[in-house]
Amino acid sequence: MYRLATRRVLAQTTQTFSKRTFSNQGFRAAKASKTNMYLGAGIALIPVIMSINYLNGNHIANEVDENKVEEGKKKAESTGKKEFVEKAEKEAIGKADVKTKVPAEEANPETRTETDKPSEESQKDEENSYEGAAYNPETGEINWDCPCLGGMAHGPCGEEFKEAFACFIYSESEPKGIECIKKFESMRNCFREHPEHYKEELYDDEEQEPLVDVNEKKGDASEQSAETIADDATKVVKEKAKAEDSNTK
């Protein structure tokens, strides 16, 4: 009896163990199949991943190359602009130098020859000639204090003398001084009114033909040449100067 019970227990235990073993083997097989499936999928994905990585690498490389190209372009443009600006500045400076270039003679006035400079002696001679004359053509002034006038500009008939003398000096008509005839006549009439001061001048007038009053015969007075009147005035001046020189001696 005990043997029969023992056999039943062994039989049940064997069945249970066999079931468990079979079930474990099935689980292991299923697990192995899943693992193999995952491995296959992973192996299949490797080319895809490599392709993606390759494309991404090329894209990154292309971006880097494009950045380098852009930087190179900008650098070239900036360098070209700088060179262009420098060239333009040099050309502008060169043009300015040409415009502002000073002739050698002006830059070095000392290099001029002595013949280009007016000699001091000639200047002194001109100054002395003007000092010895009553009229200075450069300034257009008359020196009424000049000794060559013999003091006639300051006598009783000084104003008449100044008018006649200035009229003749500044005359631009032909013959010279033709419009000054009346002024010279007025001067001579003044001389006659003051014989004590103008004896010599009146003596020269007496040697010549007596003058006709301008108011009485204008035609005769106008016929008298201006040169003759100028000569008379010159004689008066010279005689007056000689008289003063003799008195001072």
From Swiss-Prot:
Extent of motif Cx9C motif 1: 157-167
Keyword list, A-Z: Disulfide bond, Membrane, Mitochondrion, Mitochondrion inner membrane, Oxidoreductase, Protein transport, Redox-active center, Signal-anchor, Transit peptide, Translocation, Transmembrane, Transmembrane helix, Transport
Extent of Basic and acidic residues compositional bias: 95-127, 232-249
Principal localisation: mitochondrion
Motif (Cx9C motif 2): 180-190
Pfam families xrefs: CHCH
Compartment(s) where it occurs, according to its Swiss-Prot or TrEMBL record: Mitochondrion inner membrane
Mitochondrial matrix side: 23-36
Mitochondrial intermembrane-side segments: 56-249
PROSITE patterns (alphabetical): CHCH (PS51808)
GO molecular function: protein-disulfide reductase activity
Boundaries of the annotated transit peptide in chain numbering: 1-22
Annotated region (Disordered), positions in chain: 95-136, 202-249
Family annotation (InterPro entries): CHCH (IPR010625), CHCHD4 (IPR039289)
GO biological process terms on file: protein import into mitochondrial intermembrane space
Cofactor note: Cu(2+) or Zn(2+).
Free-text note regarding domains: The CHCH domain contains a conserved twin Cys-X(9)-Cys motif which is required for import and stability of MIA40 in mitochondria.
Complexes and interactors: Monomer.
Function: Required for the import and folding of small cysteine-containing proteins (small Tim) in the mitochondrial intermembrane space (IMS). Forms a redox cycle with ERV1 that involves a disulfide relay system. Precursor proteins to be imported into the IMS are translocated in their reduced form into the mitochondria. The oxidized form of MIA40 forms a transient intermolecular disulfide bridge with the reduced precursor protein, resulting in oxidation of the precursor protein that now contains an intramolecular disulfide bond and is able to undergo folding in the IMS.
Entry protein name: Mitochondrial intermembrane space import and assembly protein 40
Gene that this sequence comes from: MIA40
